Each structure stands twice: as C-alpha cells, then as structure tokens.
C-alpha cells in the first residue's frame, strides 16, 4: 500500500458497491452553509444555569468574555483541523486506485471545504484570536507528510473522522448556543458519512495486507493518539470522559478493519 501515481480508468467499473451507494447519499444530502444556517443570530456563550454557578465571582460581561476565549480556542483548532482534512482528502484522491473511492473523496473534499467555511464564519462572530495547539499542529503535519498511503488513509478516515464525530456529538448535547448546534448538526451529518466510508473502504482493502504492514499502520495511529491525547489538555469539556469515549470509538472502528489501537 505504498504511495502511487494516479490510476486511470478506461471504463466506469465499480469494485466496492457499498461505496457507490454512499456516493449516492452524498449527492442527496449536500447542504448550503449560506442559506441553511441563520448567521444573523448572536453567539450564546453560556447558559443561564452555568452563569448561576459563577455569578458571585463574575459579571455577565466578564463571564461572556471568558467563555468566548475558551470557545475561540476550541474553534481555532477545529478550523485548522478542517483545513487539514481538506488537504488530506486532496492527497488521497490522487493516490486511491478505485474510481468509486475517488467519487467519495471528491464529495468529501466539498464537505471539508464547507466545514472550513462554517467554522471560519463562527470564529468571525466570536471575534477573538486564539493560538494553535502545537501538539495538534504536529499531529496534522505527521499525517500530511506521511508518504505511506495506508498510514494516511487510516489516519484520515478512521482516526481524524472518529475524533470529529465524537467531538461534534458532545457539542450537540452540551452547547448552549442554538447557532452552534445548528451548524454542528449539519457538519456531523457529513462527518458520520465520512467515518462510515472509511470503515467500508478499509475493511475491503485491508483483507490482504501483510502483518508488517498492519503493524506499521497500528504504530502510526498509536502515535497520532498520543499526540491527540497531549493536545486535548483542556478545551473539549470533561477531558477524561471525552478521551475514553473517543479512544473506545476509534479502537472499535480500527477493529472493524482488522487493526488495533494501543494506549
């Protein structure tokens, strides 16, 4: 599964029918970030219940600024992560051999571009600058710089998409901001499809890889997990619960394609 030149096709032949079905769903469930999200709404950084717990210490204005900074830090990482996903999908599109896989990745490129758009708009509404987490930056560059197709596609479709699904599900359940929930609901619909595509494609492709190849990819994903664990030091809520749930989910997805995630 080494990196290769693009594969050209003389006929439209489908090797993985489940991917063709997924591509049909992808075409059906496209959405427009400009018309399907009401961006005129203000951001709500905290709930009344949350403020009740801190009102003896903070004014509403001060607490709003604190929560806006926290949220800006989180969404800065997400904005960067979606740009990385966009770049990774473009790399993978050039390397994958099957035409139906190219179709799915082409659709995912459009999805990732839309996610960059909505997270960028949300950051503009927060109007707070935040730094990029160095461990997350290293993780992304580790993926982008890999010259091994198996590392890159497992890292993208199983690891990053697994993290995204878990994180966005948490936001859906806990965010006090209706604008954020609407935005994340649409993004999550895409990310769930991406994660499903990864399992469908890789369970088909990994049936014939060697033990050494499996070990190499497992080592790579384990390194990604360690970097992510280091990066997730604070901005994602109850960190230990989130990390455990995310680890379990990624480990499950890897198991479906015959790989193991080691803590």
Give the predicted meaning of each segment.
Residues 142-144:
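Helical catalytic core of nucleic-acid polymerases
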Residues 172-175, 188-195, 199-213, 228:
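Alpha-helix capping/termination and helix-coil
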Residues 78-86, 108-123, 154-168, 187-198, ...:
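Alpha-helical transition-metal enzyme core signature, strongest for iron centers
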Residues 1-88, 94-102, 125-132, 147, ...:
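Terminal targeting/low-complexity segments that flank the catalytic cores of oxidoreductases
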Residues 103-107, 182-185, 215:
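Short, charged, amphipathic alpha-helical segments
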Residues 169-181:
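Acidic interhelical loop/turn segments
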Residues 125-136, 140, 150-170:
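All-alpha helical catalytic cores of prenyl diphosphate-utilizing isoprenoid enzymes
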Residues 90-95, 168-172:
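Well-ordered alpha-helical scaffold segments within catalytic/enzyme domains
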